[in-house]
């Protein structure tokens, strides 16, 4: 199985496809504008995920789940961005919105928490991306 990691920022979105062992097999990135609104950003994110999965030469069925790192205050239980100044999001049900395009388990947390978890699981590996 493979996993999709998504990093949402105020000016862009980055996506990585990783193996069970943590090896990155594909990456993608796009620029975004917060002025477009969350609906457009989610649609662009879904397209980027689909394109990156295709670039990895795997099928959507090979993807186990999607994890999203997002700046701001996050309700990880509801899959909602409570408030993100960078993105101009307020009470955005991000996981539910993305699920309209991609039917996979989707998880979200604050981007700093995601970075800390990545560092922890890499245990000081100098090649962490």
Predicted regions span which residues?
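Short glycine-rich, Thr/Ser-proximal phosphate-binding strand/loop in the N-terminal lobe
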Residues: 2-47, 80-83
């Amino acid at each position: 199985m493979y996993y999709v990691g998504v990093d949402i920022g105020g000016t862009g979105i980055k996506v990585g496809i990783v193996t069970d062992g943590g090896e990155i097999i594909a990456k993608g990135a796009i620029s975004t504008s917060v002025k477009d609104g969350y609906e457009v950003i989610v649609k662009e994110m879904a397209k980027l995920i689909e394109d990156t999965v295709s670039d990895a030469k795997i099928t959507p069925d090979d993807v186990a789940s999607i994890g999203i790192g997002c700046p701001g205050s996050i309700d990880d239980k509801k899959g909602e961005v409570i408030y993100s100044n960078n993105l101009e999001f307020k009470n955005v049900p991000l996981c539910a919105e993305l699920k309209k395009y991609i039917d996979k388990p989707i998880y979200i947390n604050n981007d700093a928490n995601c970075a800390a978890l990545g560092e922890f699981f890499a245990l000081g590996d100098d090649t962490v991306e």
